[in-house]
């Protein structure tokens, strides 16, 4: 899940990373790449040019978080959203969750360097975020389509949500010229169906991201 997302970010940023990617690392069974050089990939993920289409500040403002909110950024990588959220929520807590150990270590080191005591790096599993505490919001950016058993994943994730918590899913839309192959993308309507099967209802849909859809969910009966 996480390794493939790295390759997609390289595509989304104009192929910067793919030119340097070790082709021998690809698995014919998983179609994944191994990208252990977090320092290198930080330059790709955190390229300032990404801001123009990812619109991180507008995304965070749209989430309408309380000042002491607890947030999980699942698929956090080198901290593109996690670090911004930690700065935005000095009285809150942010869990950056990733399944790649090198990314987990990189984010933990980055949090220490930047003095972000409210940012905790978590080593998740492909089928479990392994959150240490319950949260008010889960943010997943270009991660949902990598999860193999999404209904089971979100049913388990529901156990880590505070009452009234929300799940925000941002992923590549069908029109985007960058991102995963069309066959691997998950259409918004399918996301809504799968989330409903996992016990969630659609709260809202936002349309300001040029390459991605942006959906928010809440457990049925909550709110």
Language-model-derived ranges and their functions:
Residues 51-69:
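Conserved alpha-helix/loop element of class I SAM-dependent methyltransferases that forms part
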Residues 129-138:
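A short acidic, Gly/Pro-enriched loop at the edge of an enzyme's catalytic core
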Residues 114-127:
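Conserved SAM-binding strand-loop segment of SAM-dependent methyltransferases
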Residues 100-101:
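Conserved SAM/SAH-binding beta-strand->alpha-helix loop
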Residues 68-77, 166-192:
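Conserved class I S-adenosyl-L-methionine
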Residues 151-166:
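A short glycine-rich, Lys/Arg-flanked "PGG" loop and its adjoining helix->strand segment in the class I
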């Amino acid at each position: 899940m996480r390794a493939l997302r790295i390759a997609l970010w390289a595509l989304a940023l104009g192929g910067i990373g793919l030119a340097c990617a070790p082709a021998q690392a690809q698995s014919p069974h998983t179609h994944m790449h191994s990208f252990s050089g977090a320092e290198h990939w930080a330059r790709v993920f955190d390229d300032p040019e990404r801001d123009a289409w990812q619109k991180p500040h507008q995304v965070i403002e749209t989430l309408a978080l309380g000042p002491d909110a607890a947030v999980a950024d699942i698929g956090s990588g080198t901290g593109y959203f996690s670090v911004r959220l930690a700065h935005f929520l000095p009285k809150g807590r942010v869990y950056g969750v990733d399944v790649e150990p090198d990314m987990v270590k990189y984010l933990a080191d980055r949090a220490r360097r930047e003095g972000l005591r409210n940012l905790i790096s978590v080593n998740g599993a492909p089928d479990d975020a392994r959150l240490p505490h319950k949260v008010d919001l889960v943010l997943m950016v270009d991660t949902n389509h990598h999860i193999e058993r999404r209904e089971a994943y979100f049913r388990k994730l529901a156990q880590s949500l505070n009452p009234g918590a929300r799940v925000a899913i941002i992923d590549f839309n069908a029109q985007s010229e960058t991102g995963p192959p069309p066959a691997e993308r998950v259409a918004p309507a399918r996301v809504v169906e799968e989330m409903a099967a996992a016990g969630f209802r659609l709260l809202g849909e936002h349309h300001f991201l040029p390459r991605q859809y942006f959906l928010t969910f809440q457990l049925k009966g909550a709110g």
